[in-house]
Every structure is written in structure tokens, then in C-alpha cells.
A protein has these predicted regions:
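Structural/interface elements that position substrates and couple domains in central-metabolism enzymes
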Residues: 1-176
């Protein structure tokens, strides 16, 4: 609800542009928000290839001072052990030249705008304190329910996994009743 009107308004004001060239978009942005699916393989393992491709595109356009925010469901430690080294390698920048945080998406189907604006507090955890504070500042502008900074990206990733587990257990329990 309200998404078509919001998009139309932002486009007409010149505040929203679209491109089919991800590297161009990465080069023009200073805040990069990654929300991609994480499919499961035949071996019941997360397939992170989509995330890897997006991170590579962002890395090619990453500039000092940029902030990368990962929102998709990933195994704990993915941000620190997979995304951070990939961004450093592709961009040629050192860890302290850009920000990186995990900020789990917390939306329900059909309610995305309402949820993003403040149905739930936003959890944020960076690879360092500066990244956590930068993510916090961004999401405080967007989320009326506030921001919950956690100790690090791995903790934020675990929050996302446990929220999904909680939901799945409740659905399973309801199906058994």
C-alpha cells in the first residue's frame, strides 16, 4: 500500500532513479543497502552467490567514507568473514576506509513500507563501533520505533536467524494444533 504513490513522488522530485547497471549505481551512491534472497541449495546450505555478486558490484564502486548495509538473511559471521574481505579485495580499500554493518530486514509481506518506517525497532551491528553508529544514524531517520544497536555484525546476524526460527516454530506449532 502507498508504494506506487511514493515511488511516483520521489521520481518526479528527482530523488529516486533506477538503473540496470549495478556498478554505475554503486559508483554514484555513498550508502549501499543490500537486500537479496538467500536461497537454500540441494544440500540444505545457504547459497550466497547472489550476495557475493552484489558485494562485488558494490566493491567496484566503493569510495572512502561509503557505508554498506547488509539486510538479507545470512549465517552468522558472513558480514565479517565474507563480505568485509570481499569489499576490501575488490575495492582496494582498507577496512577503516568504509563502514559495514548488518541490519536485518524486519518486514512482512504486504506491509513493507509500514514496517520499514517503524513497526519494529531496527537492529544494527557493525564490524566496528563507527559502522554501528553510522548505521544507527541512518535508521534513526527512517524508523519511528527507534534503533537497537548490538555489539557487532555477528550478533545482528544471529538476531535475524533467531527471529526466523521463532516464526517458523510458531507456524509449525499452529499447524500441529
Amino acid at each position: 500500500p502507498d508504494l506506487p504513490e511514493l515511488v511516483s513522488s520521489l521520481v518526479s522530485k528527482g530523488n529516486l532513479e533506477a538503473t540496470t547497471e549495478p556498478r554505475e549505481a554503486a559508483a554514484r551512491a555513498s550508502i549501499h543497502v543490500v537486500i537479496v534472497p538467500t536461497p537454500i541449495t540441494d544440500k540444505n546450505e545457504p547459497d550466497l552467490s547472489i550476495l557475493d555478486a552484489v558485494v562485488e558490484d558494490i566493491g567496484r564502486g566503493l569510495d572512502p567514507g561509503d557505508l554498506v548495509l547488509i539486510e538479507c538473511t545470512v549465517p552468522p559471521q558472513t558480514t565479517e568473514r565474507r563480505v568485509l574481505p570481499a569489499l576490501e579485495e575488490v575495492s582496494g580499500l582498507s577496512r577503516d576506509a568504509f563502514g559495514l554493518a548488518f541490519c536485518p530486514e524486519r518486514t512482512s509481506s504486504g506491509r513493507a513500507l509500514k514496517d520499514i518506517r517503524g513497526a519494529y525497532p531496527k537492529v544494527v551491528g557493525g564490524v566496528d563501533d563507527e559502522s554501528t553508529q553510522a548505521a544507527r544514524a541512518i535508521y534513526e531517520e527512517l524508523n519511528s520505533e527507534g534503533v537497537l544497536p548490538v555489539s557487532d555484525a555477528t550478533t545482528a546476524e544471529a538476531v535475524k536467524v533467531f527471529e526466523g526460527l521463532y516464526r517458523d516454530v510458531n507456524i509449525g506449532l499452529a499447524n500441529e494444533l
